[in-house]
Structure formats: C-alpha cells, structure tokens
Curated annotation (Swiss-Prot):
Expression tissues: Abundant expression is found in prostate, restricted to cells of epithelial origin in normal and diseased glands. Very low expression is detected in pancreas and ovary.
Keywords annotated in UniProt: Cytoplasm, Nucleus
Coiled-coil positions: none
Species name: Homo sapiens
Name assigned to this protein: Putative protein KRIP1
Length: 134
C-alpha cells in the first residue's frame, strides 16, 4: 500500500505544478476569446473561416454577417429564360470538339511516336560507368 500512496502523492504534486503556471497564463486569454463580442471573434481568422464553411458556398468573400446571400441568378433575375435572351442563343457543346477539327490528336500520336524513333538516351551517363572507370 505504501508505494501506491507514494505514486499518488507524486501525481498530485505534478498536477499542482501545471495549474499554478496555467493560473498565471490564463488571465490574459479570456478577453481574446470572449464569445459575447462578435467583433473580437471576427478579428480572429479562424472564427470567420468556420462561419463561411457553414454557409457554403460563399463565392463573394463577404464577412460573416453577410454570408447568407442568394445566388446571382435568383436574386436579380428570377427568370432563367431572360438570361439566355440576353447572352444569345444556347451553344451546343460537342463532347469531343476535336472530332470535327481537321487535326485529330488521337490519329497523329502514333505517327509522331514513329517519327521520333526509339527514346533518346539520357544526357547523364550511367552511374555505374564512373565506378568501373575508377
């Protein structure tokens, strides 16, 4: 029983040492992390980034209080057909735009590889050669 009591007393003494140092360091911390003052919270970079992640997406980069804004298409122009009338006729996107082009990269790649021939040797010599020469 005596070694158990000795270990407990040593643990309590070790536990009292960090609390004394923490009590010395802790008084300047509460005014920095006061949850009642949003100005101090927003001055910290982590606080604003957390709130912007909650109200994702936020492409405008607004502060925390103005992060909940509707997307550009819904706020100013609720009719999507007017956007197509303003920007012009809809453009049909070709899934393979090179299929109609005269230069087809897929057809030219084998010819390019044949014209180059075997792969060129590296500029640096083999590391085993200088050892053999020495």
């Amino acid at each position: 029983m005596s070694p158990v009591h000795r270990s407990r007393t040593s643990q309590t003494q070790e536990a009292h040492k960090p609390t004394s140092t923490l009590s010395f360091i802790s008084p300047p911390q509460p005014p920095r992390q006061d949850p009642k003052s949003p100005h101090i919270l927003c001055s910290q970079p982590n606080a604003c980034s957390r709130q912007s992640h909650v109200s994702y997406p936020n492409p405008w980069g607004l502060p925390c209080s103005q992060s909940k804004v509707s997307p550009p298409g819904t706020a100013t122009n609720p009719n999507p057909k007017e956007w197509s009338r303003i920007s012009g006729p809809p453009v049909s996107l070709d899934p393979q735009p090179w299929s109609s082009a005269p230069f087809k990269p897929t057809a030219q790649l084998p010819l390019l590889a044949q014209s180059l021939g075997p792969p060129a040797k590296p500029a640096l010599p083999d590391p085993a050669l200088p050892l053999q020469m020495l």
